[in-house]
Amino acid sequence: MKSMLMAAAAAAALAAVDPSAAQGPAQGPAQGPAPAPTAARPTAAQAKAFVEEAEAQLEKANAFAARAAWVRANFITADTQWLEAKASAEQNELATRLAKEAARFDGVEVDPVTARKLKLLKLYIVSPAPDRPGAADELASLLTKLDSIYSTGKFAYKGKQITLNDAEDVLRESRDPAELKAVWEGWHSIAPQMKADYAQFAKLSNEGAASLGYKDTGALWRSNYDMDPDAFAAETDRLWKQVEPFYRNLHCYVRARLNERYGDAVQPRTGPIRADLLGNMWAQQWGNIYDVVQPKGVTSSYDLNKLLVDNGYDPVKMVKTGEAFYSSLGFSPLPQTFWERSLITRPRDREVVCHASAWDIDDKDDIRIKMCTKVNAEDFQTVHHELGHNYYQRAYKDQPVLFRGAANDGFHEAIGDFAALSASTPTYLQQIGLLDKVPGEQEDIPFLLKMALDKIAFLPFGLLVDRWRWQVFAGETTPDAYNSDWWKLRLKYQGLMPPGERPADAFDPGAKYHVPGNTPYTRYFLAHIYQFQFHRAACKQAGWKGPLHRCSVYGQEEMGKKFNAMMELGQSQPWPQTLAVFTGETRTDASAVADYFKPLNAWLTQQNKGERCGW
């Protein structure tokens, strides 16, 4: 799964902006609105005037940082890193100053719109800098350095230096456990050098969060969901309990097949699964080992990888196909500048950040994607996902600055994944001419198993990345326990273990982009719930009567209008109200996941008879 690059996610230039769009600061130091006289209690009129001035300054500040981040991500050099860090520091200072000024109006009775803007202004920063000279520069430099270590990471393998992309290819294709272990350990070897910088980053970010009135950075992050931070943590626990039994069913089945393939010496029939055997560097998606775990006697009649190649797809055609999906829902075509300015393939002449991301440069229509696209099934889905971010960014661009963002950050990820759910169906592949006919029901279990290997296998990982960071920010996990606590969580939630004993200096969380990239991760867990909730509602609106997993909403313009109406709201109101606009529901509900995968869960239960499930 790939993510959208948002404010603060690219490690520097975006460190101080709304977490739903790539925006940045203007060049040169920016000044916050002048504080009201301290002798008098602030008034509602002053609060409204402050918000208007703050929005004007933030809007003016965005273009430079967005471009600085874009240039650094596409041309990684010491100079572009310096430029991005400078832009990020200036923006962080501005946003921190505005957030502190917003706190002056706590307790002032203001109209609902101003009240929401004041609240969002205090939550505008993913990692606030402490309010002291040099702190913003130090924080920005740390984040830029961490991101760049990850993005330029290479390690020695078979006599040459290889990148993450190369390593991912090995994990995807190799079935040699010794080779898998070597490559897994090789990539994780790039991260120990991040550990000290990450600890210093966490210290500075916590200091900045405390200056805004939050217990720590984790509490600040959890405050972004229109509920108390502790209530939000409890909400994620509730959702996990809804899906955990299904995950354990899948884990049990996959472990048995791995045992049959590799034997007890590599993968025992009981206990945790070895993390390097699952086809993905972080074991967050397991679809690449479908050949190992596929049902006996039942095969899929098509291979999307082969269909794409045989039909002459190249990276640009992949993106054009994604655009056509959204056009079929009634959305306007992408602007010409999208095609002129996006990075769609990996350049051969320079280092770039290959992690797929969607960008909104100017809050108008300069939207772009950046990804090193390959012609395969995974990137076919990723293209549909990333474009979902772009269409969401475009939908809310006419909102005031502080409302230009997702209803909550899980929405931004879910909207792209919602589109990808349709794009993954044989129905859609037939609609766009890649298949002559839709396979019969006998292929439902293989199809659903492939989906579950990615969608359900992801859920515990989507939860634990931020659980680890919440512990770090709260001081519950200290630097000397960074790695051991990481693996405690991976065992608890995923039922996984590393392929061998980890070195004393290991910093395995740093081998996952979103940690050095400083992108909150719970959004992806939520997105994997919301996308099925959206899909169920959309299929109902489209009049679909068959199994939920066979529904494609391609061509449903009326449904598209209602979906766009939800997107246009941005974050102008609490997310439950926005959710209700499209789904009629005001609560996140994982029952849609169960509805989608119902036939598979029953089949897995049958297959697991006699197994000692759990770990």
PLM features: residue spans?
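N-terminal helix-rich structural modules
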Residues: 35-200, 218, 512, 519-522, ...
